[in-house]
């Protein structure tokens, strides 16, 4: 499960307004890869963008979780890259194809069970150059609101992942580039991009 437009600066750069409630969409489990794996650039995609995100890993079956009880259902946290073909996103009017290709959801490097989201820095570098730099406190909807909202729609299962939105600074990843996402306390997720297939 993914949350869109959850940082005001990113909503602005996409030409949108800050939403009144979380905007959610789904990425297939076949989009998931691990740290060090290669992001495959599909031939249909003119460009592919990076999006640094905090990921929540669910630890138990849950439905309609009250905000004050979300910690009871969280197994831990990790990092995510919500890889996106921006042209397909604009063309389709919804996000499934643009964000659903195989390898379009790198996760890792590990799951941290003692992490508490607060004001930690979230950043992304592309070939060593900083492209995104913000703090988790900049999220519009925080973890309790996200889990409460998502679980009001669907039953969540152990191992489900919720990625929580990206800050401003999104942009394309060139062929054979290296993208690295960091969140203080969660380590670094690094992946390479293939040549366009």
Enumerate the language-model features and the residues they cover.
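Catalytic-pocket segment enriched in acidic/His residues
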Residues: 10, 16-18, 86-197
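Short helix-loop capping/hinge motifs at secondary-structure junctions, enriched
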Residues: 62-65, 115-117
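Ligand-binding beta-strand-loop-alpha-helix segment within the catalytic cores
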Residues: 52-54
């Amino acid at each position: 499960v993914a949350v869109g437009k959850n940082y005001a600066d990113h909503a602005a750069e996409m030409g949108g307004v800050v939403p009144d409630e979380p905007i959610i969409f789904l990425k297939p489990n076949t989009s998931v890869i691990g740290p060090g794996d290669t992001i495959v650039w599909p031939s249909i995609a003119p460009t592919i963008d990076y999006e640094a995100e905090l990921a929540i890993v669910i630890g138990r079956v849950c439905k309609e979780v009250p905000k004050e009880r979300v910690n009871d259902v969280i197994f831990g946290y990790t990092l995510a890259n919500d890889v996106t073909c921006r042209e397909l996103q604009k063309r389709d009017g919804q996000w499934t194809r643009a964000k659903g290709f195989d390898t379009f959801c790198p996760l890792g490097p590990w799951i941290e069970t003692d992490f508490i989201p607060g004001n930690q820095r979230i950043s992304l570098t592309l070939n060593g150059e900083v492209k995104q730099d913000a703090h988790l406190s900049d999220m519009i909807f925080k973890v309790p609101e996200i889990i409460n909202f998502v679980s009001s729609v669907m039953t969540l299962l152990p191992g489900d992942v919720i990625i929580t939105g990206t800050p401003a600074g999104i942009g394309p990843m060139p062929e054979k580039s290296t993208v690295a996402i960091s969140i203080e306390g969660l380590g670094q997720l690094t992946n390479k991009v293939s040549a366009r297939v």
